[in-house]
């Protein structure tokens, strides 16, 4: 159920490396379900330099706030402006239309430190 | 199941601005009795004042009907854990409204307000006595402001002793959100300490984190789990030996009035919530008052002003090394009057009886509900009991749903999802002011709901059904904020 | 008619009730329930006086109240942040209803629509008063609202200095200092001249308008100064002045706060009051305090609920916009009822009564030999008079005549007194004051 062409973090983010080498980042279906209806998302500004696992923003539901962490080192190229007016995209389509950040100049060697789809699914099973 | 008949009327859906009719007036003012004076230039004046225009009867009916949509202590059992929703004696409101109390200007010459200052001085003494501390400041206007003052006092204490590196405040994971928020406002880093399986602070975890950076610890006693810390003396000791100070969140004092004094247990400073323990009305979210009580070594740092007796008269003064003023004047005097009257009506024995009956009532509820609901900790509780709806969650119904269903039974819900460390928490605090008949009716309702969960879960998960409005779309409220009337809407 | 010495009318439990409950719990005495408290600390003695019956309690409080009579009767010309203004009877009638008075914070909206809709109305009227976009449900008082406004400006701009115009109320400055000290935020004073060039890293320019001395500031100029420095304009204003003076929002102020006490709240020796807090909608997520929003319920009915709670302490804990929890909801309700009762015409009229009476008083006092008005500009309902003798002496004499004189500000202006005139002062009151001052000036 989790696409194979991506890597996953233990903080429930997914990373998709695009054809031009840039990385698309979002949160997983598990994460959006845990959060409940997303009402607001705070994303980093374009040009921000981030180190792997650094906090890069926040996702809010009615009763909770969750930090967003970047799964890779890189520079923020753009963020998904559609989420400003339509945060519900994160709930409805977390792996596609609900994408959050596009990173450039990423450290692709870090992909190995992340989980594959099946590893992530096992990780979820352990969480119970 | 509806307990207030007026709730059968549909709520008025219009706002004041929508009721407004040009030319209507709510009150008449006397005509100008001095010669008209030259006005400022027109660029300094406003041309339009968009307030409603209503006649007086319309105003009265609008707000009276609005009030009828509320549950309140005067109308319903209100067992909100850690809120101490006890009866608010009417005589307290009456005496607080006396012109000699309600109409004094705060900056009037002190010689003309000795009655007010005397009341404040006595109240300071009573609260110092109850808390086992050396001195009290009444300047803080709520518990959270008391907490902020307390952490600022701790900060000042360490700075004066050349210990600026002490920037860490320890806070249990069960603490009320104001504790870490106040610590952060006080410039501290917060470190969370876990609780153990008995609902006590994990002493081993505590010992591992104390070091030279420790400023202090913020503890609620009894804890937000309604449990008395078994190792309280040792906790205070560990913190003191590491050079830190102990702050007490007094929100749960209703369990301890006349039973123990936090100052004697080892606390250095604490706040008290007059709008909880001392019966002053909650008002839908305030006014409150959060007096700060301190041991001798911290008393000089108390927020000011405080009232002193110089032998001839009462005076407002700032403590020698005060952290400063936290309000424009001297605190919420109108609330102080009510608390003073409450203490005078009860006396020491009466205060002790408050905590006895509060703890008795909570344990009675626990005894009667522990078969149908899970108890997070199987031990005697104090003035509140934390149940977990984890059993019901397995049947598809959550704590939230049970809370909403209680509204249909004519009870205000208990506190939900707090403390955070208990799954599907329902924190129930009956207070001493409820009769056994009310407690039994509540027990019956909770047992009935437990049955419904088994037999007709939908009626619980879609509750409430009989209140003026049903469950609200809170997601929409957050996604599309509509926070005020706008013209042309 | 001997009663048990511990009989309290506030507690229903009889000995029989207690017995039954102890049996159900399975312990033999109430003290068994306190077993977790170490023995050495159990049941300490309290030095509280013995309990009073209700009748005795009334007598006791009436006696204390009577000692304050000189502060309460007679005309009042004292302002400086707390004001004797007209309170319509409707305000207390509504505020004393048990459903408003004894309810809790509206966390269960289905049974709190009264409180929630009243908050929504309060937010609406606060915005309309100051011509601002968004308001919260109120804070403790005008001083802490201003302090929170300054801290909010620091969060929004990510800067750490707070400039304040030196005509700010001294007690407001003290509260601002208390709140900013621990967060490494540095307030610094500016004059009307030096405000033109604010220091770099200034988060906001704080202006009281009308200022502490009662005079209007040049908000247009000060707004420009703030913009030039990339800082926010934070204005602490007065809600009665808002009845006739152009509101701070119309000058582009980013945050406008005020003390709500003049809106139908008794002076009550300094509290409880309510802090009004408004800001531009772009800063909504940094707004402290509670906010009520309008939504619908599952049947599509309009309904009100606390919203955007993720800003607050119970969710965001140490990262909250403020630690505030219990605020001043009932006082906010009183202000709302006051504004609904006075309304569009009534508030304007109150403001004009204050203005004309204050200016009449100023004009006759400055004609008295020895008295002058040392400050220039436009004042609203307060002004400073320079006296021929120390204000302390003048006020002592006035008090003997049953008149509450203005605030002694001789530490700021030589022999200066800050006089306040409201709609509650009759022409006779003002003439009597002038006569007394004339006598004292001989």
Regions found by a protein language model. Name each.
Chain A
Residues 1-55, 93-128:
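Acidic, low-complexity mobile loops and tails
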Residues 21, 62-64, 72:
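Periplasm/extracytoplasmic soluble domains of Gram-negative envelope assemblies
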Residues 36-38, 62-65:
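A short beta-loop-beta micro-motif enriched in histidine and acidic residues
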Residues 61, 81:
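Short, conserved catalytic or interaction motifs in soluble domains
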Residues 67-71, 104:
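Histidine- and aromatic-rich ligand-binding microenvironments
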Residues 86:
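Basic, polyanion-binding surface patches
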